Amino acid sequence: MKKAVHFGAGNIGRGFIGQILFENGFAIDFVDVNDKIINALNERHSYDIEIAEDGKRHITVSNVAGINNKENPQAVIDAVAETELITTAIGPNILPFIAQLIAKGIEKRRESQNQTPLDIIACENMIGGSAFLWQEVQKYLSADGLAFAKDYIGFPNAAVDRIVPAQVHEDPLFVVVEPFSEWVVETAAMKNPDLKLSSVHYEENLEPFIERKLFSVNSGHATTAYTGAYFGAKTVLEALKDQQVKEQVKAVLGEIRQLLMAKWQFKENDLKVYHDIIISRFENPYIVDDVTRVARTPIRKLGYDERFIRPIRELKDRGLSYEYLLQTVAYVFHYKDSNDEQSVQLKLLLQEKSLKAVVKEVTGLTDAALIEEIVTSVESLD
C-alpha cells in the first residue's frame, strides 16, 4: 500500500486531505502534537467523516496512524524517509516549525539512497505555501542534502477549498465537512508527476486558481463574518439571512470578479456561477459556522497581501471600483471579540494611536490616498 505523511491531524487534515489520500489508496501517518487525537488514531486506525447534506452520508477513512512529533520526532523523520507523498494542513504560521523534521527526513532519504521522487504539498490558506515551506526546509539541509532535495524533492504549490467549521464531538476523530471540495496542485514544481491523485486538479500555472479561491472564498467568507458581526449575527448562516449582509457579500464578489477578469481573463459567466456556488456553500443549513471563527485574527486579515488589501490595491492600480471592499475593511476595524487575541490587540492599538497610524501599521500600505480612504471609511461607521 502507498504511504503518505500528513502534518496536521486537525479537522481539515482529517476531513479533507485525509479523505482524498485514503480514496487514492494511501495508508496515512498523521503527524500532530495533540495527544488525544494521535492516541485515538493509533488505537482505532480509522475515523468517520460526515458530509453536511441531506442524508448526512458517512465516509470511513481507514489505514491511518498517528505520530506525536513533539514526543517522537525520530518516528516522523523515519516516516518522511520512506513515504511516497507528504501533505500539510497545519496553518501558515506553523509551517516553519515542521521544516527541520522534514529536512532531517530528506537527509535520511539521501543517506539511504532513496531516490524515489517525493512531492511535499502544503495545503494551506496562503499563496505559495509549498514554496514557503521549501525556503524554511533549506535552512536545515546540508550542502549534500540541498543538492539531493533539488534533484528528488518537489514542493508544488496548491490551492485548497473546503469549509470545515469549528466543532466538538464526543469522538475526537469524528469530523463534519461540507460536500464541496477543491484541491488544485501546480505541476511545474512536481518531481513525481506520475503520482496524480483522483479528485485533485493539476494545473501548469496555479496562480489564477489560488487568487480566484483566496479572493472569492476567503474574501467572501470574511466579508460575511465581519459584516454579519457588525449587524449582530452570531453565525454565517444567520448573517446571510440579513439582506444587507448578503448584498454586501454579493457586491464584494462583484468587485473581485472585475479584478479576476482583468488580471487572469476568467470569463464573467464562469465566475458568476463560481460565486453563486460560494454563497450557497456559506448558506448550507447543515453547517453551523460561528462568525467568531471566520472573523478571528483580524490583524492578519488586514495584511498587505491578504484577502482585502491586496484586491483593493490591484483594483485601484487598474482603475476599477473597490467601494464595497473598502466598506468591509471598515467593518473589520470595528470588529470586537474579547476572546480573540488579535481583536483585543487591534482595539488596544486604536486606543493608543491615531486611526491613520494603525491603518498604516496593520495594512503595510504606503499609498497616502488609499490610507486616507480607509480612514474615512472606518470613521463613517463611528
Swiss-Prot record:
Pfam families: Mannitol_dh, Mannitol_dh_C
GO biological process, one term: mannitol catabolic process
GO MF assignments: mannitol-1-phosphate 5-dehydrogenase activity
EC number: 1.1.1.17
Positions in coiled-coil regions: none
Keywords: NAD, Oxidoreductase
Protein family: Belongs to the mannitol dehydrogenase family.
NCBIfam families, A to Z: PRK02318.1-2, PRK02318.1-3, PRK02318.2-5
Protein name, entry field: Mannitol-1-phosphate 5-dehydrogenase
Annotated organism of origin: Streptococcus mutans serotype c (strain ATCC 700610 / UA159)
Lineage summary: Bacteria, Bacillati, Bacillota, Bacilli, Lactobacillales
Gene: mtlD
